[in-house]
A protein has these predicted regions:
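C-terminal catalytic and target-recognition region of SAM-dependent MTase-like enzymes
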Residues: 67-70, 74-163
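Conserved S-adenosyl-L-methionine
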Residues: 1-72, 88-89, 95
Length: 163
């Protein structure tokens, strides 16, 4: 849903509904996906599984309780999307340098991958060991945060098979 759908003086609602129907018709449901979700906290893994089930995408995601230091993948290219702890509690704050250092080490072991990270931790780049290619200020609720984008190389284009 988009707020602009309610702007009746700009656009007739029927146009919005037609656009939504067209977008749904264009969804390619046969795309092969390899989505993996990890968290050290088992309760967070269960929560993520419940959210995926509610969204109807549970069958496309492999969930596992795992430490970021154990992040490995044999695929040459991929994406890491993460929202690690921000250090809002004092005991977490003390652990952040080591956590972000570990995130950086795990990311570097995946040579050709990209990483997208949301955090309010202002020293994230320092401890990851790399300056982000892009950094956008965002808000996660009321918490001023940053969306760091660490870009890996683009994979080579695949040739389209002749029909």
């Amino acid at each position: 849903e988009f707020t602009a759908q309610e702007w009746s003086k700009i656009c007739d609602k029927k146009i919005w509904y037609n656009a939504v129907d067209e977008a749904h018709d264009l969804i390619d449901r046969d795309v092969k996906m390899n989505i993996q979700g990890y968290d050290l906290d088992g309760d967070m893994v269960k929560c993520a599984m419940e959210n995926a089930r509610a969204a109807g995408v549970e069958q496309h995601i492999h969930f596992q309780q795992r430490d970021v230091k154990d992040l490995r993948n044999p695929k040459k290219y991929g994406f890491i999307i993460t929202n690690p702890p921000y250090g809002e509690r004092l005991e977490e704050k003390e652990a952040l340098p080591e956590l972000y250092r570990t995130i950086g080490e795990s990311y570097r072991s995946l040579d050709d991958w990209s990483m997208f990270l949301i955090t309010s931790y202002t020293d994230a780049e320092k401890y990851i060991g790399r300056k982000a290619d892009r950094n956008r200020k965002i808000y996660n609720g009321m918490i001023k945060s940053y969306f760091y984008q660490f870009m890996g190389p683009k994979p080579p284009k695949r040739r389209r098979e002749e029909a």
